Amino acid sequence: MRTQLAVLLVALVLLQMIAQSEALWGEIWNTVKGLIGKRGLRNLDDLDDVFDDDLSAADLEFLKQLMR
């Protein structure tokens, strides 16, 4: 019974440490974002250029060739 209680307490302490470290990293990231500002972080998403709404006939033909 003592061993089970000790294992439970160690597991609770480790889980609490993980939860607190996640909050710490979140605060550090928010501080860095605040220092850089919105202009510095505006163009971090490179996937915006990938999703183009306007596909030409050549683009569609190229995609068809890729899918073969």
From Swiss-Prot:
Changing N30H: In Eval418-FH5; increase in viral inactivation activity, increase in enhanced viral attachment inhibitory activity, and gain in inhibitory activity against intracellular HSV-1, which means an improvement of intracellular uptake and distribution. Residues 1-23 form the signal peptide. Residues 37-68 form a propeptide. It is found in: Secreted. Keywords: Amidation, Antimicrobial, Cleavage on pair of basic residues, Secreted, Signal. One of its GO terms (cellular component) is extracellular region. Expressed by the venom gland. Transmembrane segments: none annotated. Its main location: secreted. Belongs to the non-disulfide-bridged peptide (NDBP) superfamily. Short antimicrobial peptide (group 4) family. Probable antimicrobial peptide. Shows dose-dependent and time-dependent inactivation of herpes simplex virus type 1 (HSV-1) and dose-dependent inhibition of HSV-1 viral attachment to host cells. Scarcely suppress an established HSV-1 infection due to poor cellular uptake. Amphipathic peptide with an alpha-helix structure. This is Antimicrobial peptide Eval418. It comes from Euscorpiops validus.
